[in-house]
Amino acid sequence: MIDIEVFERHLRTKWVGRDRLLLEQTDSTNNYAKTPPRDLVHGSLILANYQLKGRGQSGKSWFGDAHKNLYFSIFIKPLRTDGLFLLSLISAHSIIESIRSYHLAHPLMNQLKIKWPNDVYIGEHKIAGILTENIFHGGFLKGSVIGTGWNIDQDHFPPKL
């Protein structure tokens, strides 16, 4: 379960997460962010304790139990469109840097890696996935949503995964 007070104490950003919403459950934090009308500002953060229909690239399902994982989306308003393809890569790099910032003395920490274009692994185990979606209206970019799911305390997975 996400503790907003702990989150606020550790927040070190200028704009990401300053405007935020915590949902107990939603079908998808990305869907929530993309569904009008939403008064989202640059850096708005949508967190959920549970996603009913989380998904990844190419419509693949994101499996996770309630209160066992971290689900969130960040809404941004890019000034340009020529670097949109980098959003997933930058997000994956940020996840790795965030994990490394805890200086965990675990032998697998040196096996953190990005599996192009949108997954983070420790060794052969996927620990996070990223889904970036862009919102266009009338041919103009209105915003981008960067959704992330982290396997935190997930201890079982469906056989087909």
Question: What positions do the PLM features span?
Answer:
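A broad structural signal for short, well-ordered beta-strand segments within beta-sheet-rich domains
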Residues: 16-17, 127, 141
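Structural motif
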Residues: 122-123
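Short, acidic (Asp/Glu-rich) active-site segment that either coordinates a divalent metal cofactor
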Residues: 139-161
